[in-house]
Regions:
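Hydrophobic micro-packing sites on short alpha-helices
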Residues: 117-122
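DNA-binding alpha-helical recognition surfaces that contact promoter or target DNA
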Residues: 39, 105, 123
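Short, charged, surface-exposed hinge/linker loops at domain edges
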Residues: 1-3, 43-101, 105-107, 111-116, ...
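DNA-contacting interfaces and partner/effector-binding or oligomerization modules
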Residues: 1-57, 61
Length: 140
């Protein structure tokens, strides 16, 4: 099974991402929500492959067989935007030690954080998740 890695960003009002390779060209999609983006990308990829087949373009066997899985690699902007469905910038700020204003700039995509800041955000989200799981487990 072939793994297709999709780089996902938050751009203005949408998640957006794409895949490109010398064998397949480029396929892109956008979506208002995370779920919509994933569905739109899967449909766009299938449509792209169908079009290549109809035009007689050569395809790798995995593409002909549709034997692939999609892995999404989220940029910090997309990660933060998706996380805001479950938490707040204030909570992420407390857990990460980063200023709320910086997080807001990262979430909108206006500023691209350095790797160290992205790692702090990821660790903060993992901590928030673990804390919420511990809280839920205490209700059993």
């Amino acid at each position: 099974m072939q793994k297709i890695v999709i780089n996902v960003e938050w751009c203005g009002l949408n998640y957006s991402g794409g895949y490109g390779s010398p064998d397949l060209g480029v396929c892109v999609a956008t979506g208002d929500t995370w779920e919509e983006f994933k569905q739109e990308f899967a449909e766009a990829m299938d449509f792209h492959l169908e079009g290549m087949e109809e035009h007689g373009d050569p395809l790798p066997q995995w593409a002909v067989d549709r034997d692939y899985e999609i892995e999404y690699k989220m940029a910090t902007s997309a990660l933060l935007h998706r996380a805001l469905k479950y938490t707040t910038l204030e909570a992420i700020s407390r857990a990460s030690g980063l200023r709320r204003s910086a997080l807001k700039s990262y979430a909108t995509g206006d500023v691209c954080p350095r790797d160290a800041q992205s790692e702090k955000i990821l660790q903060a989200l993992k901590k928030i998740s673990a804390d919420l799981q511990e809280l839920a487990d205490s209700m059993k």
